[in-house]
Curated annotation (Swiss-Prot):
Family annotation (HAMAP family): Glucokinase
Protein EC: 2.7.1.2
One function term, GO molecular function aspect: glucokinase activity
InterPro entries xref list: ATPase_NBD (IPR043129), Bacterial_glucokinase (IPR050201), Glucokinase (IPR003836)
Pfam families per the UniProt record, alphabetical: Glucokinase
Entry-linked PANTHER family: GLUCOKINASE
Catalytic activity: D-glucose + ATP = D-glucose 6-phosphate + ADP + H(+)
Binding residue positions for ATP: 18-23
Annotated protein name in UniProt: Glucokinase
Family: Belongs to the bacterial glucokinase family.
Subcellular location: Cytoplasm
Gene Ontology terms describing biological process: glycolytic process
Amino acid sequence: MSKPNNSTAPLPFPILIGDIGGTNARFSILTDAYAEPKQFPNVRTADFATIDEAIQQGVLDKTAVQPRSAILAVAGPINDDEIPLTNCDWVVRPKTMIEGLGMEDVLVVNDFEAQALAIAALSDENRERIGDATRDMIASRVVLGPGTGLGVGGLVHAQHSWIPVPGEGGHVDLGPRSKRDYDIFPHIETIEGRVSAEQILCGRGLVNLYHAICVVDGIEPTMKDPADITSHALAGSDKAAVETVSLFATYLGRVAGDLAMVFMARGGVYLSGGISQKIIPALKKPEFRIAFEDKAPHTALLRTIPTYVVTHPLAALAGLSSYARMPANFGVSTEGRRWRR
């Protein structure tokens, strides 16, 4: 019978690598520590009743390689051996997976732990620098990603090891500072009476901010889709959309600067996800870095910390693969998150 196991021993190859999102699940198989991962087509979560069916039909039925173990990144709390996902109906059941899919070992980690693992050694071709700070230090880092929500993960460098730190940093407070902020914030939709960063810095938050700007300016909002708002903003074809994305970049800079100080992220702050990639032109305007650096009495420190947008199309899978190849380089906690036959 499979059971929880806190072993830090390497996962046995071949290893199934999975990044499970709300809409899509991405999989690859790593046959050994020196091989390139074998990628599989994205799986739409809505097309399968369970993750086990998705793995069987989307991966195992398409290859002769039988994984002995799996490492999965999921959006959701990992508290026991039934792990409900935040943004889709799947439930990850490692014991069932071991019995039904013929595996020996399953490790489940937080989705932004995987993103944090990825930024340990991201090449220049997989990141876009924002601002003038260029110092590339082997030092602690932080990644934040506006998407369905606002994910945050730290990557602490200590004793020659990279230690990913998951958390709920997307729910820190975000408050007004400028006169325009004080006009807009009363119209931001709150959660239980407060404005957290995630109420603005995600897809639905972008719409929330746009609607608040429209209310303040006395105009009728015409857009309900974040993609429409960003497209009109980048094209300069809608005044409210332009201001929405400009303020989004400002607020993202404020939160990113706060997190840089929390983690003393001299190794850099990384922005991940589709929204960050799409609004790179807006992030390269002065507002993001001005807000990022405006942290008196530590402005001089923030000016030295580089900021990047992650452009790797499969960053989470790359991070998990790095860990699977060389687990000794990372301080990944397995307590309560690893099951073995």
